[in-house]
């Protein structure tokens, strides 16, 4: 399938913007198989097991989103398709340097998609749909329709109206500011766009009536000016940026025998988590359509971006949004779903006052003190122990259990609690038993040796980690097998502190021990720690 000259010119400009503005490929936590598996499970689907999934990313750039996933998920397989030969070559060099054999980048145009690649459990297209032609949009959904496993999950993100109407004003201002300046590089055009935008915004702020009338525009303008140059060049100066309404995207899915599941931001999907008045009105406006309710919600929230989770039409019959209804959270089907997850609390103890039920509050406090990761068996055991310690009435127990389920679901939706069916591997450091496997060390070394120009490091949740350092790499290389604390401290002192003659041996030991304590905790947080059976300390 051949492209027209306009699309070829658009592709060329995109690649020029990438090169001139120093684009880096981000990891995104909401695109991982474990994340998508959990969200599909939440609404009643039975997605493929994340641990051994086969994953395709379309528009993979340098591979920054899937290389990190491959490091943390060695039993899964990842394939990225990218138009730019330069980005594919650089990404594959990072993969080679990291010695990874479960991820690859392929140069190709999705219009000429290689059908021999077969089917995938999960298909990802982040930051792609809004920046391609209608023909390519059709092809993207055609690939998902024909290459997604029957119970598979896909993810597509895109800019949305109505919120992007205001952003479109900012985009048009920046395009107008650069009209007639074809000789400028894209970096210079971004600078000119930001400068002109600042001048226009400053003039509006000089007049109270204009400031009030243009408050939304000023907010959007301020947001864009503060963004990285790459984002501004990509979203506001590329020739193609095509937002749509959510209902239009949903209609496009239906045309390809695909169905919408929910958004990766559950607050856009679980309308019952808003107050009853909003939920009741949305249900009256669209009593039999989840998608229409979400479209009305987009009008209310002025939504600018969506991260849609998708399945095949044939699987959609199992979808239920009962988990979002507080009146149904404590039914057997919903409790069964909630019981299948492992959770991580993201709020701290200062937020506990939001829980009215004292037993629920005590339960969350105990869970946070224990590290914040738990399952429902553990949470219910803690709740029961708190109930018994308080000598509370037996009649108080079941209401507290109901309140606990409601609280957990509410914060799953609002983002205060992460949840997974396949929880990313995170282990505590144990002296003499724990070590850093070579795959993590090789990954960090590949980043340190030049890969950081193109991709970020990431933890086990695929959150970007931008501060990976030579000290991290040194520690990882030292902890290549289980070692005694004393051995590690001596090696750290010899490597980092022994040359400092201004410090006594005692001070050097203290600094080495502090470094050891800090780095073992950091390795835990990054998900780089694994444990071997105790074969003796070395």
Indicate residue ranges for each PLM-predicted region.
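Conserved class I S-adenosyl-L-methionine
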Residues: 156-183, 203
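Conserved SAM-binding strand-loop segment of SAM-dependent methyltransferases
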Residues: 99-110
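Conserved SAM/SAH-binding beta-strand->alpha-helix loop
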Residues: 84
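Conserved SAM-binding loop of SAM-dependent methyltransferases across substrates and taxa
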Residues: 62-75
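Conserved alpha-helix/loop element of class I SAM-dependent methyltransferases that forms part
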Residues: 20, 24-52
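Long, charge-rich, low-complexity alpha-helical segments
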Residues: 271-286, 290-306, 310, 349-538
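A short glycine-rich, Lys/Arg-flanked "PGG" loop and its adjoining helix->strand segment in the class I
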Residues: 138-150
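A short acidic, Gly/Pro-enriched loop at the edge of an enzyme's catalytic core
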Residues: 115-123
């Amino acid at each position: 399938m051949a492209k027209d000259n306009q699309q070829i010119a658009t592709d060329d400009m995109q690649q020029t913007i990438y090169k001139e503005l120093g684009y880096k490929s981000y990891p995104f936590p909401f695109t991982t198989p474990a994340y998508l598996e959990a969200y599909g499970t939440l609404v009643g689907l039975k997605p493929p097991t994340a641990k051994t999934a086969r994953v395709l990313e379309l528009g993979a750039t340098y591979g920054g989103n899937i290389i990190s996933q491959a490091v943390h998920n060695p039993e899964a397989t990842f394939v990225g398709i990218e138009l730019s030969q330069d980005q594919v070559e650089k990404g594959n060099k990072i993969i080679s340097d990291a010695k990874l054999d479960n991820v690859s980048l392929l140069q190709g145009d999705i219009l000429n998609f290689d059908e021999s690649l077969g089917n995938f459990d999960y298909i990802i297209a982040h930051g792609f749909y809004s920046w391609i032609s209608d023909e390519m949009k059709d092809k993207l959904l055609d690939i998902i329709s024909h290459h997604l496993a029957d119970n598979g999950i896909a993810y597509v993100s895109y800019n949305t109206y109505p919120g992007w109407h205001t952003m479109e004003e900012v985009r048009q201002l920046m395009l107008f500011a650069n009209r007639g300046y074809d000789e400028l590089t894209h970096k210079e055009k971004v600078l000119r766009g930001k400068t002109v935008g600042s001048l226009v915004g400053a003039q509006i702020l000089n007049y109270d009536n204009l400031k009030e009338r243009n408050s939304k525009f000023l907010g959007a303008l301020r947001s864009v000016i503060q963004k990285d140059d790459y984002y501004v060049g990509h979203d506001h100066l590329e020739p193609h940026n095509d937002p749509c309404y959510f209902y239009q995207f949903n209609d496009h899915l239906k045309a390809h025998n695909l169905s919408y599941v929910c958004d990766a931001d559950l607050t856009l999907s679980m309308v019952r988590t808003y107050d009853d008045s909003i939920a009741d009105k949305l249900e009256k406006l669209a009593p039999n359509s989840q998608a229409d309710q979400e479209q009305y919600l987009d009008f209310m929230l002025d939504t600018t971006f969506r991260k849609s989770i998708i399945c095949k039409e044939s699987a959609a019959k199992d979808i239920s949004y009962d988990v979002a209804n507080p009146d149904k959270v404590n039914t057997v089907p919903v409790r069964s779903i909630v019981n299948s997850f492992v959770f991580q609390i993201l709020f701290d103890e200062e937020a506990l006052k939001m829980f009215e039920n004292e037993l629920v509050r005590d339960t969350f406090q105990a869970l946070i003190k224990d590290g914040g990761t738990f399952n429902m068996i553990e949470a219910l055991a803690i709740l029961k122990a708190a109930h018994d310690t308080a000598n509370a009435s037996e009649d108080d127990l079941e209401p507290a259990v109901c309140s606990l389920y409601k609280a957990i679901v509410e914060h799953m939706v609002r983002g205060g609690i992460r949840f997974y069916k396949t929880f990313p591997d995170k282990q505590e450091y144990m002296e003499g038993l724990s070590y850093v496997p070579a795959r993590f060390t090789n990954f960090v070394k590949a980043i340190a040796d030049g890969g950081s120009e193109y991709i970020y490091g990431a933890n086990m949740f695929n959150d970007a980690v931008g501060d990976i350092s030579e000290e991290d790499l040194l520690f990882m290389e030292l902890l290549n097998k289980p070692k005694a604390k004393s051995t590690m401290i001596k090696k750290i002192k010899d490597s980092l502190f022994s040359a400092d003659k201004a410090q006594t041996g005692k001070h050097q030991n203290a600094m080495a021990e502090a470094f050891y304590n800090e780095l073992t905790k950091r390795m835990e947080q990054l998900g780089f720690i694994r444990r071997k059976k105790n074969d003796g300390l070395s």
